[in-house]
Swiss-Prot record:
Part of the ABC transporter complex LsrABCD involved in autoinducer 2 (AI-2) import. Probably responsible for the translocation of the substrate across the membrane. This is Autoinducer 2 import system permease protein LsrC. It is a multi-pass membrane protein. Residues 35-38, 91-92, 136-154, 234-251, 305-342 are cytoplasmic. Keywords: Cell inner membrane, Cell membrane, Membrane, Transmembrane, Transmembrane helix, Transport. Pfam families: BPD_transp_2. One of its GO terms (cellular component) is plasma membrane. The chain crosses the membrane at residues 14-34, 39-59, 70-90, 93-113, 115-135, 155-175, 213-233, 252-272, 284-304. GO terms for molecular function: transmembrane transporter activity. CDD domains: TM_PBP1_transp_AraH_like (cd06579). It is found in: Cell inner membrane. Belongs to the binding-protein-dependent transport system permease family. AraH/RbsC subfamily. Disulfide bonds: none annotated.
Length: 342
């Protein structure tokens, strides 16, 4: 049973999402509707994109805590370009390139300069946030064109164009990681760095690609944020990095690298977003959101740690079972045979 749970974390995450959707329905039947699902998905798109990028980094046994700042910086660039008169396609491409460049810089610090990922990205977290504030002067960016907001308008089945793009990206990345040699290189790099090198995997390049794509996903999340809100705050993206990591852990992405799936991270992002909608239904103040999400994350981390320890004990017991088998007992001679011998 323990091995099944460890090997099928996506199923347990899906069950958690289903339960969190069904149980509030007993309080309000209107909650159980397609409209609720589309609303939750619309709210979850930013976190889903960030969780997909974070998955790539975590699979290589690294972590990136700067994605919130990258999201904010890229959203600011998008707003500045649009207000300067550039077309939406040009502004979006420039925004994605900035995210890619920011992620590449993070990857170069980790792969080439051998700086620990948590230290490197803590530094760039402040760097990118500072660039964002320098560009805006600490002010909001408003007056964004209506065509940007159309990206988040319902298009088909209540889902926006950018929502369908997110679904396509999820499917593509799930296929890439599961079915291609390039995708398996991420797992190999995180599972055994030296072994991957001996197999010919270019581990430095893989880590740089992981960070670069993570930055690109953060930039896309910035575009989604701007299109949904319609303006850009001077604190856009603050705290999103922790939620992205939490979504990955909830979905079964190992902090030790080398295991997990994109689908699990997506379900984790959905679960965290759905918590917010349930709290609204229960009329619980919004400042409880982070507290409850933190409790859920701690519970999952404790469960994950206990599960890993239990599996290791079982594997150790199976490995040394033949050395621990007691010797066959020798039956004592019967009293009759003893008398004859006498």
């Amino acid at each position: 049973m323990l091995k099944f749970i460890q090997n099928n974390r996506e199923i347990t995450a899906l069950l958690a999402v289903v339960l969190l959707f069904v149980l509030p329905g007993f309080l309000d039947r209107q909650y159980l509707s397609v409209q609720t699902l589309t609303m939750v998905y619309s709210s979850a798109q930013i976190l889903i994109l960030l969780a997909m990028g974070a998955t790539l980094v975590m699979l290589t046994r690294n972590i990136d805590v700067s994605v919130g700042s990258i999201t904010g910086m890229c959203a600011v660039l998008l707003g500045m370009l649009l207000n300067a008169g550039y077309s939406l396609p040009v502004a979006c491409v420039a925004t994605l390139l900035l995210g890619l460049l920011a992620g590449f810089f993070n990857g170069a610090l980790v792969a080439w300069l051998k700086i620990p990922a948590i230290v490197a990205t803590l530094g760039t977290l402040g760097l990118y946030r500072g660039i964002m504030l320098l560009w805006t002067g600490g002010k909001w960016i408003e007056g964004l064109p209506a065509e940007l907001k159309q990206l988040s308008a319902p298009l088909l089945l209540g889902i926006s164009a950018i929502g369908w793009l997110t679904i396509i990206l999820v499917a593509f990345m799930a296929w890439l990681l599961a079915k291609t040699a390039f995708g398996r290189s991420f797992y190999a790099t995180g599972d055994n760095l030296q072994g991957a090198r001996q197999l010919g995997v270019r581990t430095e390049a893989i880590r740089i690609v992981a960070f670069s794509l993570n930055g690109c996903m953060a930039a896309l999340a910035g575009i989604v944020f701007a299109s949904q809100i319609g303006f850009i705050l001077n604190q856009t993206g603050t705290g999103l990095e922790m939620k992205a990591i939490a979504a990955c852990v909830l979905g079964g992405i190992s902090l030790l690298g080398g295991s997990g799936a994109i689908i699990g991270a997506v379900l984790g992002a959905w679960f965290l977003t759905q918590i917010d909608s349930v709290l609204v239904l229960l009329r619980i103040p919004a400042w409880w959101n982070d507290f409850i999400a933190g409790l859920v994350l701690l519970a999952v981390l404790v469960f994950d740690g206990r599960l890993r320890c239990a599996l290791e004990r079982n594997l150790r017991r199976q490995k040394y079972a033949r050395f621990m088998t007691p010797p066959p007992s020798v039956k004592p001679a019967s009293s009759g045979k003893k008398r004859e011998a006498a």
